[in-house]
A protein has these predicted regions:
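Short gly/pro/ser/thr-enriched loop/turn and capping motifs at secondary-structure boundaries
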Residues: 36-39, 103-107, 156-157
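Active-site nucleotide/adenylate-binding loops and adjacent lid/helix of ATP-dependent enzymes
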Residues: 107-187
Length: 187
């Protein structure tokens, strides 16, 4: 039986999760890197744990390990999902996991894997290219119909860097220029 939920991350979803858990009598522990979370101010949260490094985050979660599964780990953003995937086997022994098995997460968190899965199984998805170099982009630039978008395979680190989820390119020159600029900052 779930007695506690550890909500990982400061996404707005944390507030809704905290309120729902509190409504059914589950203790809510919010684990965030800073105080910039609306859930931080909620009376539905019984405890807030701040961390500054992954090692510190790991230690704070491990301090809630028990012999009986009674705590649910629930991420609210891609960064926290990636963290739980990294420690999935260890945490799954003592916590309920708010994510599926790592192979499922990997299939759907990386758009290259998702789109390839869809194509293989005849599921409609955007036509996509996966260039590794600017030379690949130049070759693709002659094959596509414009406008196109440049979108990363994994969103959260791209969005942190550029403040956008995608870039629209209206022609070949714009595609090559944007891809070159992105490649300099986002390997």
């Amino acid at each position: 039986m779930v007695r506690n939920v550890i909500i990982l991350g400061s996404h707005i979803q944390a507030l809704g999760l905290a309120r729902q858990a509190n409504t059914i009598g589950v203790e809510v522990i919010l684990v965030i890197p800073d105080r910039y979370s609306v859930a931080y101010f909620s009376n539905a949260v019984s405890k807030v744990l701040l961390y500054s490094t992954e090692k510190e985050l790991y230690g704070k979660i491990c301090s809630y390990k028990t012999n009986v599964k009674e705590t649910l780990l629930f991420p609210t953003n891609d960064e926290m999902i990636e963290f739980l995937v990294k420690y999935y086997d260890e945490f799954n022994e003592t916590f309920y996991m708010g994510i599926p098995k790592p192979e499922t997460v990997t299939l759907f968190s990386d758009k290259r894997n998702t789109y390839r899965f869809c194509e293989k199984n005849h599921i409609a998805c955007p036509h996509s290219w996966y260039p590794d170099t600017i030379e690949d982009v130049k070759q693709i630039a002659d094959e596509v119909d414009y406008p196109v978008i440049i979108k990363p395979s994994i969103m959260y680190s791209f969005h942190k860097l550029f403040g956008k989820k995608a870039f629209r390119c209206n022609d070949k020159n714009e595609l090559i220029l944007r891809a070159t600029a992105i490649a300099k900052r986002f390997p």
